[in-house]
Swiss-Prot record:
This is F-box/WD repeat-containing protein 2. SUPFAM superfamilies: F-box domain, WD40 repeat-like. Widely expressed during embryogenesis and in adult tissues. Residues 54-101 form the F-box domain. Keywords: Acetylation, Repeat, Ubl conjugation pathway, WD repeat. SMART domains: FBOX (SM00256), WD40 (SM00320). The modification N6-acetyllysine is found at K298. One of its GO terms (cellular component) is cytoplasm. Substrate-recognition component of the SCF (SKP1-CUL1-F-box protein)-type E3 ubiquitin ligase complex. The keyword Acetylation applies. It comes from Mus musculus (Mouse). Directly interacts with SKP1 and CUL1. WD repeats lie at residues 146-183, 185-221, 224-265, 276-314. It comes from the Eukaryota.
Amino acid sequence: MERKDFETWLDNISVTFLSLTDLQKNETLDHLISLSGAVQLRHLSNNLETLLKRDFLKLLPLELSFYLLKWLDPQTLLTCCLVSKQWNKVISACTEVWQTACKNLGWQIDDSVQDSLHWKKVYLKAILRMKQLEDHEAFETSSLIGHSARVYALYYKDGLLCTGSDDLSAKLWDVSTGQCVYGIQTHTCAAVKFDEQKLVTGSFDNTVACWEWSSGARTQHFRGHTGAVFSVDYSDELDILVSGSADFAVKVWALSAGTCLNTLTGHTEWVTKVVLQKCKVKSLLHSPGDYILLSADKYEIKIWPIGREINCKCLKTLSVSEDRSICLQPRLHFDGKYIVCSSALGLYQWDFASYDILRVIKTPEVANLALLGFGDVFALLFDNHYLYIMDLRTESLISRWPLPEYRKSKRGSSFLAGERPG
């Protein structure tokens, strides 16, 4: 049949076909299929999938596709990436879904970074690390060798680790290389904290000292405690140093002058931790940006005003038992929003805005875990034998790692958690 005659015939057939009922159309198609050969059936098979299974992700505007993708969980999105190159391209380009996925894993999101592939890679890296945690393959160990006596004090900041020892020295290490950056002669160190220029040490000789890294010289000596100084913190902005001691006292010092500004009393046990931190929420007694002074002993956490008033009164005392039947572990976490401390019953988390207990996370599998670090998604805990990682969303222990042999300190100074930006 000539092409022109065929087109005329096809037009007539089409008009007639459109006039049929659905049942008649179906019978017509069945009859045509029965008359078709292999070439026609293959053609039908190839085109039916396109006609019946529309690729909505390909056909929809990109904005609508992104809106639909936001309803899927990350694991489903990764599966969808395997459907086709087009699906992988669209899904990988949706910045918001990958940022949200990273945020749900506890990642700090920089909204200025809008590279979708960057956030997808971050998520995949985090998932791999989660798998490594579950398989106990996420840790590496290294040793820093240099002290000749017990190491009693640790502090980590920006990839640098400071160690204070009974050998009357403090050393600053580059964690990534294992190299000692500075080594200076000090007194016995029970607590250390440092920045680029200086080192502050609390000592078993009942004093606090400030040292210059570059020269090793002692630039300030703070005398006044009658017991070992177990914890120190300072603020250059306020020009204030605070210290907690075995004499049950917290002292506030002028950092540059070395003079004692105030002595805060009220503790009836060793003060094992002091924290000087900016408030990030509006509380009953503070506003965002205000500096907060916290101190902790075996049973209580106290919140103090930062001032020079004599006989200064504690603003608030937090505890987990009124009869002192439950002890607090010596470590304390405060990020400006929440106070977290461990006890024999589990982790206690207080809301700093109201001072109410938000939750108690119990660890029935392992008792008496000490707190090492507390984040948005994970917490680091340890006992005499293992380091544990807890998923705070499920309140379950997801991994553990054997610790080297050590003598547990009543001050909780045996271990610390490092921090990485982002």
